[in-house]
Regions:
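Basic, helix-initiating cap at the start of DNA-binding domains
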Residues: 1-39, 43-48, 65
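Residues within the helices of the helix-turn-helix
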Residues: 43-44, 54, 64, 169
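Amphipathic C-terminal alpha-helical segment
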Residues: 156-179, 192-199
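Helical hydrophobic small-molecule/effector-binding pocket
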Residues: 72, 76, 92-119, 128
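Amphipathic alpha-helical linker/stalk segments
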Residues: 31-40, 47, 68-98
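Amphipathic alpha-helical packing segments from all-alpha helical-bundle domains
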Residues: 104, 108, 114, 122-157, ...
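Short hydrophobic/aromatic patch on the recognition helix
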Residues: 50-60
């Protein structure tokens, strides 16, 4: 049967379907990773998204763009926590708030960080995204500190490590601490470092 639809309409329809399928695939990957599936298979994604396996394979040809869309979705989800202003004007109070905020952020994002760690070696986007995340963490920490502490390289490096996503991940995943225990452990390290420089 010959279609009497204009070619542009048929093309636009295919483009809309492709976009919708892509959104379903990204949402499916996010849900699978959130559920603890570190490296979802094409079959798992197809089942979760409700699309055909061939459709998934077509999108899997460009994994970096899928990772980018997943990262953008996560950033939008976490932005209200990141952007919230500090209630405290005192630098120590800001650090306490930063720890509480990062504990919530890291806990919500940890399944995605675990998955990203597995794939980073073969993804230019994930490597760049990791570098961006670490740069943002350091900049946020520097903005909360007194100038003399920010410029103390040993102190800053140690505090940056204590408050990093990697430390949270190690305490939660490798040492198997509960979220409250992980937060208390980091708080102990943070206060010990502050005490070590006489503040």
């Amino acid at each position: 049967m010959i279609s009497h639809q204009p070619a542009k309409v048929r093309f636009d329809g295919r483009r809309v379907r492709r976009h919708r399928n892509r959104q379903r695939i990204v949402a499916a990957m996010l849900e699978l990773v959130r559920a603890g599936v570190i490296s979802p298979s094409a079959e798992e994604v197809a089942h979760q998204a409700g699309v055909g396996l061939r459709t998934v394979f077509r999108h899997f040809d460009d994994m970096d763009s899928l990772y980018r869309e997943m990262a953008e979705t996560m950033r939008r989800e976490l932005q209200p926590i990141v952007a919230a202003p500090f209630a405290s004007e005192d630098w120590k109070g800001k650090l306490d708030e930063m720890l509480e905020r990062r504990a919530r952020l890291f806990e919500r994002a940890m399944p995605f960080k675990n998955a990203a760690d597995v794939h980073r070696h073969r993804s230019a986007f994930l490597r760049k995204d990791y570098e961006t995340m670490r740069s943002e963490e350091r900049a946020a920490l520097a903005s909360a500190l007194l100038p003399e502490l920010k410029n103390d390289k040993k102190f800053f490096a140690a505090l940056d490590h204590a408050l990093s996503f990697s430390t949270w991940q190690h305490l939660r995943r490798d040492q198997k601490l509960a979220p409250a225990q992980a937060r208390q452990t980091i708080q102990f390290a943070m206060r010990s470092l502050i005490g070590a420089v006489g503040k």
